[in-house]
Amino acid sequence: MGDLPWAPPEAQAPSTAGAGDVAEHQVAPARFLQGAWRQAAGWLCRETGAAPGSAQAGPPETAHAADPQPRGPQAPPRLPPSLSPERVHPGQPAAPAEPAPGAPALRSGPSQPRGLRLPVPVPACAGSSAPGSPAALPDSYPWPPPARNRPATLPPTSRVSPLAAFLASAPQR
């Protein structure tokens, strides 16, 4: 499996030294996704010839070597007082109804559920691509593009009819 650069690192057998060692052999999901994004940015930018913006060269395993991220069990981050479990009640907003002094006024309007908005990093090469690449097509380019394997138009029926009559009268083998 070493010839597939996009494959996740293989899981190693846990050692008997303790739970801390087992955690070191497992890839955290966020770190793995970060490596997958870097790999995708490399693929996108390889076709256009531009260098990816923040992507590092090399496999994802070496790209994470400089990440200063502590390992092992960690305490959960502290919540702000407005979100503490004692003050949050189901069906009520956790934020105060009036804006803070100096803050813009809150807009009242129809309440719409928000979709899951995740920031999607875009490599630097995606915006400025080489001419002729798919990302550089003008807005007036027809979509979908014309098919290349479309059969040639049939000849007029005046030329097809005699051929069809000849084939129909030919002896079958």
Curated annotation (Swiss-Prot):
Residues 49-60, 123-136 have a biased composition (Low complexity). It comes from the Eukaryota. Residues 70-83 have a biased composition (Pro residues). Residues 1-23, 48-173 are annotated as: Disordered. This is Putative uncharacterized protein MGC34800. It comes from Homo sapiens (Human).
